[in-house]
Regions:
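Sec-dependent N-terminal signal peptides
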Residues: 4-15
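Acidic, serine/threonine-rich low-complexity disordered tracts
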Residues: 21-97, 102-211
Length: 211
């Protein structure tokens, strides 16, 4: 489960970095339902994946608007697509308050996590703090034109000396991230668009204890 957790940490960590990084965090707004962005990612310089972030739905609970964020990871060297869906507040500042997580690994049934399972996932993501650096302890290098597989983008370039990471963000891209490089990962935008639907069509089973 390590690599999916790292990818969750990238997504959630981007938006929970803290008030000192407002310039960076302001760009990391979650898009409207249906918008998506797909990346080529490499972990530990050896594990290539195609990763898609998407907003696949929305709910209103207890007077608060929530969004279903989906992370889909497709490994290049082996079978076993992994899908995570996270129900989170629509505000980037509150994204750490995950309400539910649904996971599907390969052909296995989709499983729904809540309660203690969600807390455990949060704890694992906290331990992977080196991937929470997209907006953590960063300085703005400046505006920079970057070329990635998706094309050429005018970005804001951020760098963290503490975490040896760099990120390039653009307002026009869903989830804002165009490129990110850290000690153990690299990500570059392949394509983006609208019309994303849930990659999980079945009713998820509960991972909680059976009663």
């Amino acid at each position: 489960m390590r690599k999916p957790i790292l990818s969750l940490a990238i997504l959630l960590g981007m938006a929970t970095a803290g008030q000192a990084q407002e310039t960076c965090i302001e760009q990391l707004k979650f898009p409207e339902v249906g918008r998506w962005a797909e990346y080529k990612a490499v972990y530990n310089q050896k594990d290539p994946y195609t990763i898609r972030y998407a907003v696949v739905g929305g709910e209103r609970r207890e007077g608060k608007d929530l969004k279903w964020l989906e992370l889909r990871m497709v490994p290049e060297k082996k079978d076993g697509t992994i899908i995570y869906q996270m129900l989170v507040p629509g505000s980037a500042a509150e994204v750490g308050d995950v309400q539910e997580i649904i996971m599907k690994s390969g052909a296995r049934p989709a499983m729904k996590m809540d309660g203690m399972m969600v807390k455990m996932i949060r704890g694992q993501m906290d331990k992977q703090s080196f991937l929470k650096d997209v907006c953590k302890d960063v300085t703005l290098v400046g505006r920079e034109r970057v070329i990635v597989p998706a094309g050429r983008f005018q970005t804001r370039h951020f760098r963290s000396e503490k975490y040896s990471s760099e990120s390039w963000l653009a307002d026009k891209v869903p989830f804002a991230m165009v490129k990110a490089v850290g000690k153990n990962y690299e990500m570059a935008l392949i394509r983006s668009g609208a019309g994303a639907k849930s990659s999980i069509t079945e009713v998820p089973q509960s991972m909680g204890p059976k009663r």
